[in-house]
Swiss-Prot record:
The encoding gene: pyrB
Taxonomic lineage from the root: Archaea, Thermoproteota, Thermoprotei, Sulfolobales, Sulfolobaceae
UniProt KW keywords: Pyrimidine biosynthesis, Transferase
Domain of life: Archaea
Subunit structure: Heterooligomer of catalytic and regulatory chains.
Gene3D superfamilies: Aspartate/ornithine carbamoyltransferase
InterPro entries: Asp/Orn_carbamoyltranf_P-bd, Asp/Orn_carbamoylTrfase, Asp/Orn_carbamoylTrfase_sf, Asp_carbamoyltransf, Asp_carbamoyltransf_Asp/Orn-bd
Protein name: Aspartate carbamoyltransferase catalytic subunit
Enzyme Commission designation: 2.1.3.2
Biological process, per Gene Ontology: 'de novo' pyrimidine nucleobase biosynthetic process; 'de novo' UMP biosynthetic process; amino acid metabolic process
Annotated positions binding carbamoyl phosphate: 49-50, 99, 127, 130, 258-259
PANTHER family: ASPARTATE CARBAMOYLTRANSFERASE (PTHR45753:SF6), ORNITHINE CARBAMOYLTRANSFERASE, MITOCHONDRIAL (PTHR45753)
Physiological role: Catalyzes the condensation of carbamoyl phosphate and aspartate to form carbamoyl aspartate and inorganic phosphate, the committed step in the de novo pyrimidine nucleotide biosynthesis pathway.
């Protein structure tokens, strides 16, 4: 039994083994079995896709699920501290899947709990299972994770999905990674210092769009701007439009962790590069296999 706090809790070989097991699950050659297990989904921050996909993943493997989707539904709203909540949850479940607004909260929970903790998003720090889904999608599309050219577009400072992706790529030797964002939303220096592959920071996706194998888009977060006019200006300038995508190679891929707001023109959905709904379809099978490996893999 293990915790999943960061993508770097896995080795390269462990990630590839997880992906191979997910392949077998999708082809009918493997079925995760969690009969008699209980999964607690502790979402102190609102979530739709992640919470529901973990619930579906657990149920499809035969586990029971209990949990909450807001701290307002818990004793935290009465002043209970996180450590006490985690100690209570592990009395009820065999694994805790947790999302929390504070950076480092998942690591703290894992230190408190004797049962495994899976990080479903901790503040702006990481979202490891989303990165696993993203990289699984890339592998399915390209047949490899090595030597590819990636672009990350949008909010690269606060998007925890981007942090996890940049970290997981240290295991797979990309050709180059382009970081495309407004100056105020550049990737944080401490993240860049961890990277062992070529990186170039840009402000316009059009400069490199024809080179990309994978374009990973994130939404510009309104809550990060004090000036509403500045937000609207930045949001519109980082909106992926139909004409820009027409300049991409047909075999390249656009990914997005979702939810999408207005950062991808909806006309792009029918273009061959649009792979974000395919990406989302892999969430339940991969998380089902991951839950099996966390709770029953040994």
């Amino acid at each position: 039994m293990r915790d999943v706090i960061s993508v770097l809790d896995f080795s390269r070989d462990e990630i590839l083994q997880l992906f191979e097991l997910t392949d077998k699950f999708l082809s009918g050659g493997f079925r995760p079995s969690l009969e008699g297990k209980i999964v607690a989904t502790a979402f102190f921050e609102p979530s739709t896709r992640t919470a529901l996909s973990f619930t579906s993943a657990a149920l499809s493997a035969g586990a029971k699920v209990l949990g909450f989707s807001s701290d307002e539904a818990t004793s935290v709203s009465k002043g209970e501290n996180l450590a006490d909540t985690i100690r209570m949850l592990e009395n009820y479940a065999d694994c805790i899947v947790m999302r929390h607004k504070l950076d480092g909260s998942a690591k703290f929970a894992a230190e408190v709990a004797k049962k495994p903790v899976i990080n479903a998003g901790d503040g702006k720090r990481e979202h490891p299972t989303q990165a696993l889904i993203d990289m699984y999608t890339v592998r399915k599309l390209f047949g490899t994770l090595e030597g590819l050219t990636f672009g990350f577009l949008g909010d690269l400072r606060y998007a925890r999905t981007v942090n996890s992706m940049l970290r997981i790529l240290t295991l797979f030797k990309p050709k180059i990674v382009y970081l495309i964002s407004p100056p105020q939303l550049r990737a944080r220096a401490e993240i860049l210092e961890e990277l062992n592959y070529p990186v170039k920071e840009l402000t316009d996706v059009k400069d490199v769009v024809g080179e990309l194998d994978v374009l990973y888009v994130t939404r510009i977060q309104r809550e990060r701007f004090l000036d509403e006019d500045e937000y609207e200006k930045v949001k519109e300038s980082y909106r992926l439009d139909y004409r820009t995508v027409e300049r991409m190679r047909k075999e390249s891929a656009i990914l997005h962790p979702l939810p999408r707001v207005s950062e991808i023109d909806r006309r792009i959905d029918s273009m061959p590069q649009a792979k974000y709904f395919l990406e989302a379809s892999y969430a339940v099978p991969l998380r089902s296999v991951l839950l099996h490996e966390v709770m029953a893999g040994d």
